[in-house]
């Protein structure tokens, strides 16, 4: 099980690397799906099945919509692939930054950091991932509404930017 979790962590890092160094939006989707599946599998191995499923549906669904939109706007007849030297240089640069960050933070010395699961502890009868979602909707309702309002504002800004000088999605009647 330890090797499987280590493999999921490696896939998560490689998926994030693939998203960060993608040459075109066509190939960024592959890294996004890999990172999302590996991250949610990692949460699933820790026992957070509900949070893993919700994050997988929301994050992957939302990000795939963004990538589909950017793919439709990017009209590259010959998109760059991951085998180009410039993209390989970006990937190697990201790996060097990651290794330097790990060494500087001292994570290499502390392999026994302890992993806990989200099962109920002591007198609690509700799993911690379920109570976290309930607390998000009860205590975090203000931030939830502010984030929704910000996303709605962002949608209107993007629609106005895409519209340009012609009549677009928002028209004066």
Curated annotation (Swiss-Prot):
GO cellular component: mitochondrial membrane
One Pfam assignment: Oxidored_q3
Signal peptide: none
Membrane topology: Multi-pass membrane protein
SS bond list: none
GO molecular function: NADH dehydrogenase (ubiquinone) activity
Enzyme Commission numbers on file: 7.1.1.2
Localization in the cell: Mitochondrion membrane
Stretches that traverse the bilayer: 1-21, 27-47, 48-68, 87-107, 139-159
Keyword annotations of the record: Electron transport, Membrane, Mitochondrion, NAD, Respiratory chain, Translocase, Transmembrane, Transmembrane helix, Transport, Ubiquinone
Top EC class, one word: translocase
Catalyzed reaction equations: a ubiquinone + NADH + 5 H(+)(in) = a ubiquinol + NAD(+) + 4 H(+)(out)
This protein's record includes keyword Translocase: yes
Membership in a protein family: Belongs to the complex I subunit 6 family.
Function of the molecule: Core subunit of the mitochondrial membrane respiratory chain NADH dehydrogenase (Complex I) that is believed to belong to the minimal assembly required for catalysis. Complex I functions in the transfer of electrons from NADH to the respiratory chain. The immediate electron acceptor for the enzyme is believed to be ubiquinone.
Name this polypeptide is given: NADH-ubiquinone oxidoreductase chain 6
Name of the gene: MT-ND6
